[in-house]
């Protein structure tokens, strides 16, 4: 059930689907992107060409991308991998996977780019669930190296391993998430930090500017060189154990989203999109 370099079906041509199409086109794959939206299909060729140029990939590869309005029109006998990147609606994804299973060759991997739903729920009703896995890219997908390959309880490990290998050949930095947990790994790490930051702001400990400064010019400054585990390997786990033992009881662990931020959202203060969030924004500052 390994994905063989040939043709990839990208289901959904929106922001994520378009970026995923760019990744595979840059890698020399034939790309078949399906979207029911005529507007999306019309825009996709130019978007892929622009993405290839930004990546420094051969622009002639854009000619290997095709768009389709419906699933049955894809050349399924040639498709070696399916990546679903449709709207984040669970019933829609389940319906798509059911239709794809009836069309795709039985030996090819079927992957979902979902960031919200368990892979197990997306593929639970399929007859051949062992070939279903998560392939979670981060926006902008063609520029951000990280990809999470997610195994559900029924995913064949060989499928996950083949996707990890494939992502490496496409120049990505994949990790294998071996349990189908909410948020996978990247989003859990981001939100763990964000929860602490928002509560520190809500409790008047520090300003929003102070939080961003602490991250950008403190520990975040080192992250491009090494992650948190390697950093502690370097500084010593004995030191970390002492600090963590003293500090962890004081960290925010509530499951509730901060009321102060909820109130801000209720007022319509959503950030740049509404010209006000923690800060006020103008067209010039944006």
Whereabouts are the PLM-identified features?
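NAD(P)-dependent Rossmann-like dehydrogenase/reductase catalytic/cofactor-binding core
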Residues: 2-4, 27, 169-175, 179, ...
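Hydrophobic/aromatic beta-strand patches that form the interior of the parallel beta-sheet core
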Residues: 32, 68, 83, 133-135, ...
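Rossmann-fold dinucleotide-binding core
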Residues: 109-183, 187-188
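Rossmann-like NAD(P)-binding element
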Residues: 39-43, 53-109, 117
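NAD(P)+-binding Rossmann beta1-loop-alpha1 motif at the extreme N-terminus of oxidoreductases
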Residues: 1-54
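Rossmann-like dinucleotide-binding cores of NAD(P)H-dependent redox enzymes
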Residues: 33-60, 151-159, 174, 182-189
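Acidic/polar active-site rim loop that often engages polyanionic ligands
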Residues: 26-29, 140-150, 224-226, 245
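Structural/interface elements that position substrates and couple domains in central-metabolism enzymes
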Residues: 32, 169, 186, 190-196, ...
């Amino acid at each position: 059930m390994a994905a063989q370099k040939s043709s990839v079906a990208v289901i959904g041509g929106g922001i994520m689907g378009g970026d995923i199409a760019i990744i595979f086109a840059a890698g020399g794959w034939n790309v078949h992107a399906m979207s029911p939206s005529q507007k999306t299909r019309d825009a996709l060729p130019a978007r892929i060409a622009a993405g290839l140029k930004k990546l420094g990939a051969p622009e002639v590869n854009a000619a290997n991308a095709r768009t389709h309005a419906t699933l049955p029109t894809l050349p399924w006998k040639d498709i070696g991998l399916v990546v679903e990147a449709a709207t984040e609606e669970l019933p829609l994804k389940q319906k798509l996977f059911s239709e794809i299973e009836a069309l795709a060759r039985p030996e090819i991997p079927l992957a979902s780019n979902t960031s919200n739903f368990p892979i197990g729920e997306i593929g639970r009703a399929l007859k051949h669930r062992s070939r279903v896995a998560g392939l979670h890219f981060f926006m902008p997908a063609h520029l951000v190296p990280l990809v999470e390959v997610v195994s559900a309880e029924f995913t064949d490990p060989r499928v996950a391993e083949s996707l990890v290998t494939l992502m490496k050949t496409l120049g990505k930095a994949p990790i294998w998430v071996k349990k189908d947990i909410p948020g996978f790994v990247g989003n859990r790490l981001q939100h763990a930090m964000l929860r602490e930051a928002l509560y520190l702001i809500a409790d008047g400990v520090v300003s929003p500017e102070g939080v961003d400064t602490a991250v950008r010019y403190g520990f975040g400054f080192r992250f491009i060189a090494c992650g948190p585990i390697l950093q502690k390997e370097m500084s010593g786990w004995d030191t970390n154990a002492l600090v963590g033992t003293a500090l962890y009881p004081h960290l925010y662990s509530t499951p509730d989203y901060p009321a102060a931020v909820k109130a801000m959202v209720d007022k319509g203060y959503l950030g740049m999109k509404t010209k006000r969030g923690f800060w006020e924004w103008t067209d010039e500052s944006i």
